[in-house]
Structures are given as structure tokens and as C-alpha cells.
Amino acid sequence: MAPPSTREPRVLSATSATKSDGEMVLPGFPDADSFVKFALGSVVAVTKASGGLPQFGDEYDFYRSFPGFQAFCETQGDRLLQCMSRVMQYHGCRSNIKDRSKVTELEDKFDLLVDANDVILERVGILLDEASGVNKNQQPVLPAGLQVPKTVVSSWNRKAAEYGKKAKSETFRLLHAKNIIRPQLKFREKIDNSNTPFLPKIFIKPNAQKPLPQALSKERRERPQDRPEDLDVPPALADFIHQQRTQQVEQDMFAHPYQYELNHFTPADAVLQKPQPQLYRPIEETPCHFISSLDELVELNEKLLNCQEFAVDLEHHSYRSFLGLTCLMQISTRTEDFIIDTLELRSDMYILNESLTDPAIVKVFHGADSDIEWLQKDFGLYVVNMFDTHQAARLLNLGRHSLDHLLKLYCNVDSNKQYQLADWRIRPLPEEMLSYARDDTHYLLYIYDKMRLEMWERGNGQPVQLQVVWQRSRDICLKKFIKPIFTDESYLELYRKQKKHLNTQQLTAFQLLFAWRDKTARREDESYGYVLPNHMMLKIAEELPKEPQGIIACCNPVPPLVRQQINEMHLLIQQAREMPLLKSEVAAGVKKSGPLPSAERLENVLFGPHDCSHAPPDGYPIIPTSGSVPVQKQASLFPDEKEDNLLGTTCLIATAVITLFNEPSAEDSKKGPLTVAQKKAQNIMESFENPFRMFLPSLGHRAPVSQAAKFDPSTKIYEISNRWKLAQVQVQKDSKEAVKKKAAEQTAAREQAKEACKAAAEQAISVRQQVVLENAAKKRERATSDPRTTEQKQEKKRLKISKKPKDPEPPEKEFTPYDYSQSDFKAFAGNSKSKVSSQFDPNKQTPSGKKCIAAKKIKQSVGNKSMSFPTGKSDRGFRYNWPQR
């Protein structure tokens, strides 16, 4: 057993400090330290005693032979198992370790012991982390309408039930309030949930270096006077239609209004110098103002314009609204805290654009990725010159980047995050929620100073890291809010995330339910999670219930809008059930890999069951590439025409876009102007040059040479052009074209020869057929032969031969006989001493004194025997007459 951790006494002593002086933590011990010391001594003594026991082997077997030692071991073993069983039972583990067999279940006992140790040590680690503050005990946050299960209270457990009721009543917090009047009803401008792109709400641009586009500055004033026909449509849709009518540039409409200012923004030199951290004022001494009127908002804006920096944070609610609502805005300066009721001042918040877009004032945010989009969506507010402490924490490589960690690290303040998911639409706000919102910005300016100082010290007096943080914060300020747009394929994105396979009916139901949920959420201004959560929608699509009660059975708890419109949903399910039941992988574009069919295996020569190089990763089959390869078409959910078999039309074979072995032809150049991608590909192809081309002028991208330098004798170009004449470009082109033309003629001649050989082979008659035809012709001649006719035929043949023109005979040459009197007859003698010829004579015998008698006999015997076959027919039938020795 390992000794306890060194931080355990510190934690237990801290817990003992909360107890009263007269109360003991454990019986017999005044505090936790004394108990830890006693337990540690006992553990050390037990460890030493266990080391003195006989070791397993011959020594243990010898002692085991004595009955007294055997009885002692069994007694102590039972005591240990009983203690272990109690400890395991206390921690909720399986505690039947003592009741098992001693021989057959030894491994099971060991497994139980290992599992129990893991559970106990994990629980000890969690409790130590909670005591040291690393991991706080998070209280559950549940909706207000959720009914907590109640225990049946009787006379025997009434006290326990009352105690549990008191303890559990403090653990639940509100996620959303049930009986709140919707703040959307009080807004002066109706919320735009239409399925159109988001248009910026800004119509006045303070601190502008580039004026606001005319399409945005005049849109609010044009609608009531100049466009009365658009009064019955949503404002955003009316603006969008008007822009399409007047053909105004969409780039100006949807561009970031402060993009020019942000691109040309540079932080001041003062914020890049070494800072002097200014300690925050105690929260009890800092005044806090709740802004809920227009006059107070204007006064706040004037105060902010006189500050050098201020901190900003937002509280957002997204459960009971389609696009979400910004319910609260907190602003803190060095001396004051402000909380703005943005639900009440929603239409007047544009006033703060004057201070938020001032490039001379630093705005400090923490995790502003969502805050920037919320400010644009609800108020038309934009931020210039922002410092994001979240990006600074990432650059400093801190352990965690949350605001809770920064408060604990720099300010030693423990923040309570139990109201993070609270319903911020509640009015009036409780004091606890106001205090939570105020803490988010009260300490942020001091954290901003401390982080700047730390980055300055890490940069060795150089503001490199500070500039990186401002650059990242500027990129966040350039973000734009994008409204969710519904399309016919929107459901596929959610369907692919679920990793479930649906057939055609289920997929159709999923598509119809997704469209119904989107339409209902936009109309009722509710979120997707409130109308119909994703898991419930997928469950209904999988089950396809036949009755409305089945739809309700798939939802627990049942959303209110589902219960109200259950009949409409039932009609959608019936419509989906009428679809033909087919596989949905091809329709939905979900690729599913599988083995090749048997027909493809037979046709494909290169197929191997374990050869992965020929199997594409997306599961499409491979077909032989001898013919033309089909091209994959664009997938569609409901095709108008019935497509052919997938195996024959959707073969994906990768082909090189750029290759070294293709020369650009004249036909490709005549097709038309090249796109940007084609030009890039052409440039890459031109870069693949033959290494021997370096001595020839390049065909393209020539270096600019002045014409005067070519005719100036003092220049190097003139000298090179006169001394070394290189091949001209046109000559190279002509040679290439000649080679191509010759190759084309050769291929055409080869093809023609192949066709001629093929035709001759088809018309050729085999040898057997020729013999049969000759025999048949001979039989016919014999049958029809007559002596008179034969004589006539012979005479005709003689006449034909005589009529043939004879070739002219060559002139006769004069014959001169050879004079043998002048010849040397000694050359024919065997032993004559004539001149030795320089040429080798194979028939010439070498003179030798001793002659080999055996070789002579062998030659005579071989010469006397005949190796020929006898002529005539044999009397022994079909047997051959082989020569005998």
C-alpha cells in the first residue's frame, strides 16, 4: 500500500478548520493531522511485518506443513478479506470477495480487488481536486419546468426526506423562465427571420475614413416613401428585392462597413510600451449603474468617449429565439461599472457606435468571437481597436484560457459560473445575476494590464507579442454575422453527422421534418432545440409511426409545438411512408464501401482480394480501362431521369491534370481563353523543361531585351548573337510538327497493315480445306473425262504454250578453253612439298609418325555399316524396319 500524498494533510487540515473547537473530526483524534500521522505509522508497520513473512516457495511450503501456522494463516486471511469487503461495500463496489471459492475463483478475486482500487483512487483524486480548487463541484442547472422525482414519504423515512428536500432545493438553477412575457413583442422593429441573407443594420457610420455605401445609408428612409408596394413584406426582403431591382452592387451591401478602417488600423505607441498595472478598485467601493433609458445611454456614451480604455461583455439568450437575443451588456471603466438593459434600449444602441469604433480607445473583450456577431445582429454595432484577453492567454500558453482561470490567476478571485446558462430575459434581474454580470468586466482592465506586462517581459522589451494579439483581435473584429439559410440539401449536413443509415422512406421523413422545423422556428421565433431537438427528429424518422400517438411516444418530454401541430407532422410521416422503399446511399450521397460484384471481378484482370492499390477509398468499383472511362455525374436526391446502373456510369479513375508526356497541340490553343486554373496548369507544364534545353532559347517567358542592345557592338548580346547562332523557335516548331506528322503517318500505316492482315486471315483457306477441294476437283475430272475431250484439251494447252512470246536469248560469248599445260600437277599429290597455304584446310591430314590403330578400326567398322532404311513395303505390317547392329 502506497503512502498517502503529501497534500492530503493540508487538505484535511483545511477541512478541520471549518469545524468548531470542541468537535472532533474522527473519534479519538483532535484534528486530521494527528489521524494522518497515526494511519501512516500503522501502514509502515504493516508493510514491514508483511516483508518478514515466509516467501512463496520452499520456505512457505515448509512452514505450511505445521498445523498451527496453517490455522493462523487462514484466520488472518479471513480477517483481511472481511476488512476488504467492508471497505469495498462502503465505496459502492462489489463486496462478495469473501464468499467465493479459494482455488477456482482466485483470478476473479484479484480482478475485484483491482477494480475496487481503481474506483477508490479515482474518487480520492476527484475529492483532492475539489478541495484544492482545481475542479469545483458543479451544481446541476436544470429547467424550471422539470419535475424532480419525489421519494415516497412514510413514517420511517420522514426525517430523511425532509433533510434531502432542504439539501436538494439549493442545487437547481433556472435554465429558462416559464412565465416570462416575450421581449420580442415590445421591440419597435420586427425581428427578421426570413430565409434571406443578413443585411447590416447600420445606417450612420461614425469615425469613418471611408463613407458608408449608399445602399445602407438610404435603405431605412426609402422604404416608407419610395416603395409603398413593399410594406407588406419583411424589411430585409424588401431591401433585398429593391437592390435586385435597381441592380446595385451586392458587394457594397454585404461587405463589412468598417473593413477599410480595420485594415488600416495600427495600435498607438502608448499601448505598445511597457505598462504600469493599475489595480482595480474594490467592488464594494465601485459604483454600479443600471442603464435602462435613452438619456442614461447618451450620458454613458459621453463618459466612454473620455476614457482611454474600457471593458465590454455580453449576456445572450438563444433558447427561446431563432437567431438569439442579446439581453444584457456590461461595460466597466477604471472607476465605474455599467449594466445596460439591451432589451429595453434595443433600437437606440446604435449610439454606442461612436465610442466602440473610436480607434483611440481600447476596447477589452474576453472571447469576442460570438460577441462581435451578436453586436452586429441585434444593434448594428461594430468594434475598432479591440484587445481580446482570450487570444492573449493563448499566446502566453497558459494552462487554461477561460475568464474564470484568469480571475483566479491574476486577481485571486473565485467566480461563480452557475448563472452562465441562466435566463437573462428575466426582469427585474435578481441581485445574484447582477453581481455575476458585473464581475465579468470589473477585473478585466487589470487583467489587461497584467497580460500586457507579461508579454512585454517575455518579448525582452519588444512589443512583438502585443502586436500579434492586436492583429488577431483585428481579425475577430472583421467577422460578419451570417444568417442561417435553408436549402433543399440543408438536412444532409445534419444527417451525415448522425452516422446512421436510413432508407428512402426514413430519409424523406427526415427531410420533411427538417423543413417543417425550420419553417415553424422562423415563424414562431423559436430555436430548433425548442421546436424539435435533433435526437427526437431522428427518432421519429427512424420509427415512422403510423399514428399521432407514436410521434408523441418518440418525444420525452414532448415539445409544446409538437403537441400543437401533431396532425401536420402525422401527414408528413404518411407522405414519407408512401415513398418506394429503396436504398438511400446513392440518393443521399452517402458513400458505402463494399466488395466488387462477381461480374466485375471476372472482367477486371488486375483485381485482387487483398490488393488495396486498385480499390478507391470512396468505395466505387473499378472497371477495365480498355475503353473510354465514364465520368461521374452530379449526384441528386430525386433525379428526373432514371439513371443507368451505377457500376457502369460512376467509375472514378484518377488522371493526371499535369503531365510531362503531352505536348500542347494546336487544337487546345484554339478552344478559347484559358481560365485562371488552366493558366496555372500551363505555367507548371512549361516549367518542366528538358535539361538540355538550357542551351536553347526558351519558347516563352523570355527575358526583356532592348532592341538597341542587339545592334550595339559593345554589348554582350551583340557578341553572343554574332558568334553563336542558336536554333530559331520556328525551326523547333517545324521539327516538332514534322515528327508528329511522321508519327501519325506511321501509326496510320500500321493500322492499315493490321486491317489488311486481319481481312486476309479471315479470307484465307486452311490446308485441310485446300486438300478436300483438290480431291473433289480430281473426282469430278475423272467422272467427266473422255478420250476425245482430253485430246482436245491437250491440243489447246499446246496452242497456248506456242502462242506465248519467247524471251529474247542473250548473245553467246566466245568460249576460250583452259590451258592445262601451265598448271602445277604437284598440288594434287598428297606428299608433295608445295607451298604451305595460309588458309586453313579442314580436309588436310597432319603427318604423324605413329598411327592410332584403334581409331582406324573404329572408322572402318563405322564405314562398313549401313545406316539407310530398306526400300519397299515391309512384310511385318505397320511396324518400322529399324537398322540392326
Swiss-Prot record:
Lineage, broadest ranks: Eukaryota, Metazoa, Chordata, Craniata, Vertebrata
Name of this chain's protein: Exosome complex component 10
Organism (species): Homo sapiens (Human)
One GO cellular component term noted in the UniProt record for this chain: nucleolus
Subcellular localization(s) per the UniProt record: Cytoplasm; Nucleus; Nucleus, Nucleolus; Nucleus, Nucleoplasm
PANTHER family: EXOSOME COMPONENT 10, POLYMYOSITIS/SCLERODERMA AUTOANTIGEN-RELATED
GO biological process: CUT catabolic process; DNA repair; exonucleolytic trimming to generate mature 3'-end of 5.8S rRNA from tricistronic rRNA transcript (SSU-rRNA, 5.8S rRNA, LSU-rRNA); histone mRNA catabolic process; maturation of 5.8S rRNA; negative regulation of telomere maintenance via telomerase; nuclear mRNA surveillance; nuclear polyadenylation-dependent antisense transcript catabolic process
Pfam families (alphabetical): DNA_pol_A_exo1, HRDC, PMC2NT
Activity control, per UniProt: Arginine-rich dipeptide repeat proteins expressed from C9orf72-derived repeat RNA interact with EXOSC10 and inhibit its ability to promote degradation of this RNA.
Variant or mutagenesis effect after changing residue 873 to R: No effect on sumoylation by USP36
Subunit structure: Component of the RNA exosome complex. The catalytically inactive RNA exosome core complex (Exo-9) associates with the catalytic subunit EXOSC10/RRP6 (via its N-terminus). Exo-9 may associate with DIS3 to form the nucleolar exosome complex, or DIS3L to form the cytoplasmic exosome complex. The RNA exosome complex interacts with cofactors C1D/RRP47, MPHOSPH6/MPP6 and MTREX/MTR4. Interacts with MTREX; the interaction with MTREX mediates the association of MTREX with nuclear RNA exosomes.
Keywords on record: Cytoplasm, DNA damage, DNA repair, Exonuclease, Exosome, Hydrolase, Isopeptide bond, Magnesium, Metal-binding, Nonsense-mediated mRNA decay, Nuclease, Nucleus, Phosphoprotein, RNA-binding, rRNA processing, Ubl conjugation
Induction of its expression: Down-regulated by mild hypothermia (at protein level).
Covalent cross-link Glycyl lysine isopeptide (Lys-Gly) (interchain with G-Cter in SUMO1) as placed by the record, residue numbers: 583
